Amino acid sequence: MKPLETQNQPGRIGKALAMAVAVAALGWVAWTLWTGNRSWDASPETAEVPDAEPAVAGAIPPDFPRPGMPGYQQPPAGMATVGTPPGARPIPSPATPATARQLDAASLGAEIQRLREALLTAADGRGRQRLIQEFGELVATAIGQLGADAVAEELVRLLGAGFEDIDFRLPFQPGFDGRMETVPNWRSLLLDGLAATASPVAADFVRNHVLDQPRTTADWAMGLKVVWEASGQQRDDPYFSAKLAEMLRNPTWTQQPTGALLESFDFVVAQHNKDLVPDMVRFLEGETDSGTPFAASIVLQRMASADPSVAATVVRETTGVQLDAEVAKSRATIVAKLDPTSEAHLNVIRDYLADPGVSADEADYFLRVFPQVNVIITPNIASTQYPDTRETLARKQQAGLALFEAWAADPAFASQRSAIEESVARLTEVVEAARRAGIL
């Protein structure tokens, strides 16, 4: 899959949000399907993937850090690395797949060891991705046959056995099925298996041996995933909240963000953690090439569309501040996610437009994109996305049209007349199409 230009230049938020790969019937709502290749896949915790075209989602951008390039980091000392020895080929699966056999603790351990050996000698990135998927299927089968606690106990045994880690040279990439699409190393893969068990055994191990002290962002992210699943995805878990905040406020990690760190922003959405919204606002002003502003913008857009207080926090945290042009566009896009059918949302919009720190260019941009109904659908480490129905989207567009018609007659908006008239024309076309289709 060809990476989007903006995924390697995440500061160009406006362009990224405008790139829709599918447009719904009637041309009145754009849905952006974004299934991988995020800019933050190029993480110091990952390394080169030999394949130019991996077979599954999560392909590596062409400028992915390689030895000698900025951002490349050698695997930690003592970590085995996958390679392509002379004559290497993927190790075949046994004649009877584990998913088709009755497992016990011993055979589960043997199957996991087989996959470990296969991952060490797999000839290419495609092979490693297939083996990672096979591991997930094995864990799911074992949970069904042995029970979650028994599987967790076996994985904990393996994690505590003092094994040599394996650097897979793959990115930290969630999948759409709740499992990881790819992980950077063997330890992360075992932790993903623990997360699938949602077992108290898994959570206890992680609290004492993973989240007890900072090691790597991949370790911490997977530890959070284990605790999140074991708690039943409990939003108000104080331990989880504290550990998430600890990760997002670790200066060593935030100054050199990895894919695992940026994917962990999604926990803020999943938990609807409004205490961390100010942190997300600060991340908007990070180095654009790091992917941090783009990731933070997505988090804030998703939260603001459901809760106007999030957008209000964004406005409050940036009131009176002249922002960089790209950050200003990001702020405008977040506010544009607000619902014009809600008076509470409209109050936030009024405060935003009255802010002296909002430049004429930013206000013009906001007026041209509001109401923002584009949706970026992503594979996420924790949260689930529920896009609006056609009817809900049409009602938002209709309310937006009424608002723009009122603004067109308001002398206070005289300087933005061009943007307002453009939006009136845009929304009139959309609303008329929805009426013809019987949606309104």
Predicted regions and their residues:
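Alpha-solenoid helical repeat scaffolds
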Residues: 221-225, 294-297, 329-331
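Hydrophobic membrane-insertion alpha-helices, especially the h-region
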Residues: 15-32
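Alpha-solenoid helical repeat architecture
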Residues: 258-261, 291-296
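Extended repeat-based scaffolds of very large eukaryotic assembly and lipid-transport proteins
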Residues: 33-285, 316, 379-440
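Long amphipathic alpha-helical segments with strong coiled-coil/leucine-zipper propensity
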Residues: 193-194, 299-303
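Juxtamembrane low-complexity tails/linkers enriched in Ser/Thr-Pro and polybasic
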Residues: 1-10
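Short coil/turn helix-boundary motifs
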Residues: 213, 251, 287-288, 303, ...
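Long alpha-helical repeat scaffolds
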Residues: 301-381
